[in-house]
UniProtKB/Swiss-Prot annotation:
One of its GO terms (biological process) is axon guidance. Keywords: Cell adhesion, Cell membrane, Chemotaxis, Disease variant, Disulfide bond, Glycoprotein, Heparin-binding, Hypogonadotropic hypogonadism, Kallmann syndrome, Membrane, Protease inhibitor, Repeat, Secreted, Serine protease inhibitor, Signal. Residues 661-674 have a biased composition (Basic residues). The lineage of its organism: Eukaryota, Metazoa, Chordata, Craniata, Vertebrata. Residues 186-287, 292-400, 425-523, 550-658 form the Fibronectin type-III domain. Has a dual branch-promoting and guidance activity, which may play an important role in the patterning of mitral and tufted cell collaterals to the olfactory cortex. Chemoattractant for fetal olfactory epithelial cells. The gene is ANOS1. The keyword Nucleotide-binding does not apply. Expressed in the cerebellum (at protein level). Transmembrane segments: none annotated. It comes from Homo sapiens. InterPro entries: Anosmin-1, Anosmin-1_Cys_box, Elafin-like_sf, FN3_dom, FN3_sf, Ig-like_fold, WAP_dom. It is linked to Hypogonadotropic hypogonadism 1 with or without anosmia: A disorder characterized by absent or incomplete sexual maturation by the age of 18 years, in conjunction with low levels of circulating gonadotropins and testosterone and no other abnormalities of the hypothalamic-pituitary axis. In some cases, it is associated with non-reproductive phenotypes, such as anosmia, cleft palate, and sensorineural hearing loss. Anosmia or hyposmia is related to the absence or hypoplasia of the olfactory bulbs and tracts. It comes from the Eukaryota. This is Anosmin-1.
Amino acid sequence: MVPGVPGAVLTLCLWLAASSGCLAAGPGAAAARRLDESLSAGSVQRARCASRCLSLQITRISAFFQHFQNNGSLVWCQNHKQCSKCLEPCKESGDLRKHQCQSFCEPLFPKKSYECLTSCEFLKYILLVKQGDCPAPEKASGFAAACVESCEVDNECSGVKKCCSNGCGHTCQVPKTLYKGVPLKPRKELRFTELQSGQLEVKWSSKFNISIEPVIYVVQRRWNYGIHPSEDDATHWQTVAQTTDERVQLTDIRPSRWYQFRVAAVNVHGTRGFTAPSKHFRSSKDPSAPPAPANLRLANSTVNSDGSVTVTIVWDLPEEPDIPVHHYKVFWSWMVSSKSLVPTKKKRRKTTDGFQNSVILEKLQPDCDYVVELQAITYWGQTRLKSAKVSLHFTSTHATNNKEQLVKTRKGGIQTQLPFQRRRPTRPLEVGAPFYQDGQLQVKVYWKKTEDPTVNRYHVRWFPEACAHNRTTGSEASSGMTHENYIILQDLSFSCKYKVTVQPIRPKSHSKAEAVFFTTPPCSALKGKSHKPVGCLGEAGHVLSKVLAKPENLSASFIVQDVNITGHFSWKMAKANLYQPMTGFQVTWAEVTTESRQNSLPNSIISQSQILPSDHYVLTVPNLRPSTLYRLEVQVLTPGGEGPATIKTFRTPELPPSSAHRSHLKHRHPHHYKPSPERY
């Protein structure tokens, strides 16, 4: 660094496909360390790519850089026509090893893409080939000299070892000249300054730079919740900045978190690694109370045989509070025949864990107006922090009818909500029906193309959030890039809930990613439909053990409201054949029809599946078609596999004759038609 140069600080945020969840202790720790290493390696190689771009510019216009070598050089490169083309692949968050550089660069720079192409090829190379040179074959000794093919590429070797020839085979060997031309590590002492603006400034200092190439610093952090710092409970290391200065200012520092940082000095030749983790830092600010629960709504209502009513209330969990929610308090009270509410002392109350977003209220009186209040509670030491209360008004028995629900907070006004099944907007992402082809379970995800003319690529990322057999440990996220408005996801696992994010790629700005969830069916559901044999094996290649448990008394009821039909499907379980603990239920429903359906979207969803927790025996399906046969399958899920399916066919009721004439009045007269539920 040259002192006294007024260079601007540039922070290039890297869009990593890393999860920020806490690491699990135990068998998953090794997998977590491998994930940390792979993510860190990717960040370092992208910094090497950026350093190469700066090195090329120093060569071309060395006179300019004699007094301007490091400070501000990334800023300069970003604003330089040729250098910015070179930097573009270095910022790419997708896996370039799976894509052609030409398809990446030419849409961005149709006329002159040479700088982008050469930079992309360099990045692909260093992502596959580790730094350092292989020793001469005759130098190999011990196991390294064995005449075996123990590796094919460098990434198959641990640590800094490379896949090298020993004259009669290939083995993992320590390279020679590992640090030739590589800058020294920064000094391990990092200094923290909490600014009045709320930002955190992190500073470090460099040792003598033994390289003439520009040095780029990669800054990573990890954190844990709690009163005390803990490396065992910390997140993965995440790259938060890439800069040519010896400082960085971070804006997203949250109270109640213990942060650790580390820094690596990188040039085109590589790095000596990251500094040791810094001392822990925690903001001096006190954490805020949790936000009020959002989108409180009624998800299900069932009339029991004794005349009482059971309802399910759901809400959206907060995305990232200062402190995780410890528990939720739920209060409910009622009034009869439009009279005043019951006294406060007769209010009912219960609590639910902070990670849950639903509660079941049982033994409600029919035809009563209820008020439900919800409040989030967190703890900071001995201090209890409470959110504002949110309330929901509904009428029992007819709760799923088209009666408007009123939701309000103590600090705000009243907000009108449509019922749960009517509130769903048109989703930005759609998922087709899973299908089995070429020996793989696949699914098509599609979306509406953005109107922004600068967007011609989409970064897609997908991973299993939960599986029926609890085999997601170590599962890595997959990602891809496409120019189309769809992508086919391949090699999926059976009986898993997947999350998919799609992010438009803009040349000079960061776009918001949209997300969608879908559930893959069990293998047995496709086995009977496929013309070719489908091998229903576990992930380790072993046939899943037989499960005898089977749902019983599968029944359905339908509520007709104007032109909408909502189905409530329920079942019971007999414990006699349950020799293994249940992990949930796999529910699959589909229309039984040979008619083609008119739909503007490709691969319209005719069959759908959902995985429910083991304590949920009811599924609500809105927007069913009138007078239509539906086939419902319910299976028990256990760690050993799926049980036999209980199958039943139901026909939805017809719409009342006047529904078509009344449909334009449904918002004006919501109580005009209230049929009793039809039961099967």
